[in-house]
Amino acid sequence: MAGIPDHIKALAELSPVEDLLLAVLREGLPGIRVKSLIDQHETFPLVLVRRDPSFGEWAGDTRFTDAARVAVHTFAPDPNGDEDAAVLGEAVRVVLRDAWLKNRGVPGRGHITRVDLNSPPRRASDWATATGPVQYADLPTGVWRYEAVYDVYIRKPRARPYPLPH
């Protein structure tokens, strides 16, 4: 048996928040690669979306909503990579805000009901932000990264993301 059985998948009421945000950002940023994982030989510009571990109390309601702290990384190459990554970070903010104000939904993934900017886009010098003695590899020469953190609130989809096949 490969993967998990359909009847187990059908129990899920929420899909990964990244799946909803990938769909929203890909639609709102045509021509820009938007992903949740980095390829070994990545090309730029790039927007990377990742759910952060939550600290404190989770703000969702398992009957109706999900809540997530999400890190959004924007990468851009020279020339003008520093400015381009900053501008791309601002474009992401606008797309997410507009998705919230329009109650944007993605079938099987949910609806964005609120987006709060927790930490605005800021320049970072390596692949990921280190918060302890662990340090991450430097970015490729000529590539710039900005990181922002959002708190995203999601109403679960009307239909479960993985319904049983009929």
What do the predicted segments below correspond to?
Residues 1-32, 53-166:
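Charged, amphipathic alpha-helical segments and their flanking helix caps
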Residues 34-42:
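Short acidic low-complexity segments
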Residues 44-53:
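A short, hydrophobic beta-strand-centered structural micro-motif
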